[in-house]
């Protein structure tokens, strides 16, 4: 079995598959992805494969510059997005936005 290239929490799987979640916000450890990359996607909890995505763009963002567009692309409110990012990446302020589409 091939390894997954990127993982998402299981709670995001349905939104990704339905096209409601079209970005992911990551820390520096996952800043190497670039437009055109095709990635196998798995669940964080069990590493089970659930789809393949293509990276369509990348950019940088800080917690303070997250906006309503980011929230819409994550399929959540801006307050919820900021809370989730702060929980996943405590004490960090610089992040990398990975735009993607399911293949």
Swiss-Prot record:
Record flagged with keyword Hydrolase: yes
ASCH domain boundaries: 6-94
Keyword Hydrolase: yes
Pfam short name (any one): ASCH
SMART domains, alphabetized: ASCH
InterPro entries: AC4CH, ASCH_domain, PUA-like_sf
Family stated for the protein in its record: Belongs to the N(4)-acetylcytidine amidohydrolase family.
Protein name: N(4)-acetylcytidine amidohydrolase
């Amino acid at each position: 079995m091939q390894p997954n290239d990127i993982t998402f929490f299981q709670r995001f799987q349905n939104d990704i598959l339905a096209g409601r979640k079209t970005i992911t916000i990551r820390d520096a450890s996952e800043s190497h992805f670039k437009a055109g990359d095709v990635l196998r996607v798995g669940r964080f909890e069990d590493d089970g494969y659930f789809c393949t995505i293509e990276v369509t763009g990348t950019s940088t963002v800080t917690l303070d510059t997250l906006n309503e567009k980011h929230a819409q692309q994550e399929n959540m409110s801006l307050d919820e997005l900021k809370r989730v990012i702060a929980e996943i990446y405590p004490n960090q302020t610089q992040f990398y936005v990975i735009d993607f589409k399911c293949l």
